[in-house]
Amino acid sequence: MSVADINKQEVVKQFARGTNDTGSPEVQVALLTARINELTPHFKAHMKDHHSRRGLLKMVSRRRRLLDYLKKNDADRYRSLIEKLGLRK
């Protein structure tokens, strides 16, 4: 198993709402946040990598849409997720 798979399983286990939960908004946002945080140092070193930056921006916008959905439907879950991930300052 690769390091990414192990990290992914840990994130899913930490944010899952049930035993087999992999698709809830909390899990999806947590996985996207982990991938975004993993890619951020790459862009500090390779500022002109615009092709990969587009993928990063797509991930950020997907996370934003999921957070908007969660905020609209269940504000308490939204606030707890933001607090756990440390997204808002």
UniProtKB/Swiss-Prot annotation:
Gene3D superfamilies: 6.10.250.3130, S15/NS1, RNA-binding
InterPro entries listed in its UniProt record: Ribosomal_uS15, Ribosomal_uS15_bac-type, uS15_NS1_RNA-bd_sf
Listed GO biological process terms: translation
CDD domains the record matches: Ribosomal_S15p_S13e
Record key words, sorted: Ribonucleoprotein, Ribosomal protein, RNA-binding, rRNA-binding
Record's keyword annotation contains Transcription: no
A single Gene Ontology CC term: cytosolic small ribosomal subunit
rRNA-binding keyword on record: yes
Example GO molecular function: structural constituent of ribosome
Family statement drawn from the similarity comment of this UniProt entry: Belongs to the universal ribosomal protein uS15 family.
PANTHER family for this protein: RIBOSOMAL PROTEIN S15, BACTERIAL AND ORGANELLAR, SMALL RIBOSOMAL SUBUNIT PROTEIN US15M
Purpose: One of the primary rRNA binding proteins, it binds directly to 16S rRNA where it helps nucleate assembly of the platform of the 30S subunit by binding and bridging several RNA helices of the 16S rRNA.
Subunit structure as annotated in this protein's UniProt entry: Part of the 30S ribosomal subunit. Forms a bridge to the 50S subunit in the 70S ribosome, contacting the 23S rRNA.
Protein name: Small ribosomal subunit protein uS15
Species name: Ralstonia nicotianae (strain ATCC BAA-1114 / GMI1000) (Ralstonia solanacearum)
GN (gene name): rpsO
